[in-house]
Amino acid sequence: MARKFDIQKFRNFGIMAHIDAGKTTTSERILFHSGRTHKIGEVHDGGATMDWMEQEKERGITITSAATYVTWKDCELNLIDTPGHVDFTVEVERSLRVLDGAVAVLDAQNGVEPQTETVWRQASKYKVPRIVYVNKMDKTGADFKMCLESLNERLAAHAVAIQLPIGAEANFNGIINLVTMQAYMYDGKQDEEFKVVEIPADMKKEAEEMRHHMIEEVVNFDDEIMEKYLNGNELSEDDIKKCIRKGVLTAEFFPVVCGTSFKNKGVKALLDAVVDYLPSPVDVPPIKGYKDDGSEILIKNEDDGPLAALAFKIATDPYVGKLTFIRVYSGVLKKGSYVLNATKGIKERVSRLVKMHSNNREEIDEIRAGDICAVIGLKDTVTGNSLSSEEKELHLEAMNFAEPVISLAVEPKTKADQEKMAIALSKLSEEDPTFRTYTDDETNQTIISGMGELHLEIIVDRLRREFKVEVNVGAPQVSYRETFTKEADSEGKYIKQSGGRGQYGHVFIKFEPNPEKGFEFVDKIVGGKIPKEYIKPIKAGLEDAMKAGPLSGFPMIDVKATLYDGSYHDVDSSEMAYKIAASMALKEASKTAGLVLLEPIMAVEVTVPEQYFGDAMGDISSRRGSIEGQEQRGNTQVIKAKVPLKEMFGYATDLRSFTQGRGNYVYAFSHYEKAPKSLLKK
């Protein structure tokens, strides 16, 4: 079957931002103006198409990444709407991995906010080209120039305006396109009708200055056009667009546009910018893959290449069961065919292929390189697994996710709920890699862990609504960690003789701190003192032992272990014996390696009216917080601080109380830090 759209006409992009910047509203307008929906859904009344979970409709926030596709100007746009709340950054992370471009949405009143910084960092990690859309230009306090400054100062982003707003706040009624030097004046109707007119006389000088600045910045990306410009020749519209596009593709230059999605102003111009400047799958560099022998290969977005796809999200559909969202990087995948899950080494059947419009399904026969769709029928595939053909096994780079920082105990209310709860928790942890569940060996309680209080609140809510499981919930607990602060050499020797074959494992391991680098294992065995087949079990033995540290039973992190000596027995040595010997060495080292307890520290940003500034500062200090900075935004004060997660429990209630409901805050995990001794005693 031939392609409906040439691969160069594809745009795989995400919409990302801080909570409440207007991502979902912008997505809804994109669906409406591209003809995908015939009625605009609103977030505030629970009618948004992209927010389809009950919890999303109630809370007016986006929890999962809804995927949809639209057509605009002969291009097919795969659009992913991602959450802005810090507890759901995993959704942003896995979406960015499979997208080619992104639109970063800013609130015109607030500019760059904490979660903007987080998602921007994530996008930079994957070198995702971006356009910035300054939304809510009609809002009181909207300030386009402040947004530009905050992009350059807080994100160190090379951001340049390619549009200018005409008016602001209640008087926002148009946009100046600096590429074409035309003004779009809106008549206020719902369908974003606008007239193309001359630039208002009182803005002509500013527009010319901003255009000059834009051209000076963008000609750097094309030598030929730069020469033309330096020789005093006038640049055409196509010349400027070509330079902007080249700049965007470097993922180091970010054009800035503006509008107000709720009032339907600027969305069509944003769609034009997506088509004009964001990359197609063939514009981005080939991705790295690995053959079954471990050798590296570059995978190009080509239909006639070998099949290479990545599962980036699992969702449960009430009608068809498990949906596996995939991005195809190379080759063609047909419904009814078999694929190899290269990560797990198993064969799976593709029963059906569906393109998603929010939570509605559209059946398709095949999916080609560069496209995104959902697969029905993959029973064992999970997030991060690589899919390829059986004939040519290919592995893509795995996806890494943050460890949970908060836990709580849940118990079923009735015997009937017990079995249902186990199945439900298994499904939920399959969908969300940052959600973990396990049984505490000592108390026999079921523990659930996640990225924040809201994350776990949503999980418990889903247990009740989707899976009809009633549970009692314990108080939240912080997920502490343990680590070494000094070097230590230790020996682990495990010998067991009890008739017949014995057990023998003997190791010498040097342990040392490995700040913020996780667990690192180094094999320095020479001369065959320990046979090669026992090296992996030694590493596995250490990893198992580190799951429950010697100090308080919390997982150990940031430790480097160097295996440098040992011995073996021809008959009695076994994998199990070396696993035990490794754990004995770790236990021995903990006596002299300065074992300490670490607690999670959160980066907190509190916004309060000026009259509550002193109260807010005092409250943060009382929570063992350290003030990092403050700034004034309009008539509010913004306080930036680092506060231990343990001290943040109940903060929302307290803040609401002393600010009469006028204060708000956001927080994100920052790092682990040595906990005070008083905490250890507790």
Swiss-Prot record:
Q: Name one Pfam family in it.
A: EFG_III
Give the subcellular location.
Cytoplasm
Q: Which SMART domains match?
A: EFG_C, EFG_IV
What positions does the domain tr-type G occupy?
8-282
Q: Which Gene3D superfamilies match?
A: 3.30.230.10, 3.30.70.240, Elongation Factor G (Translational Gtpase), domain 3, P-loop containing nucleotide triphosphate hydrolases, Translation factors
The family database entries (InterPro entries) matched by this protein are listed as: EFG_II, EFG_III, EFG_III/V, EFG_IV, EFG_V, EFG_V-like, EFTu-like_2, G_TR_CS
Similarity field? Belongs to the TRAFAC class translation factor GTPase superfamily. Classic translation factor GTPase family. EF-G/EF-2 subfamily.
Q: What does this protein do?
A: Catalyzes the GTP-dependent ribosomal translocation step during translation elongation. During this step, the ribosome changes from the pre-translocational (PRE) to the post-translocational (POST) state as the newly formed A-site-bound peptidyl-tRNA and P-site-bound deacylated tRNA move to the P and E sites, respectively. Catalyzes the coordinated movement of the two tRNA molecules, the mRNA and conformational changes in the ribosome.
Report the HAMAP family cross-referenced here. Answer: EF_G_EF_2_B
Q: This chain belongs to which protein, by name?
A: Elongation factor G
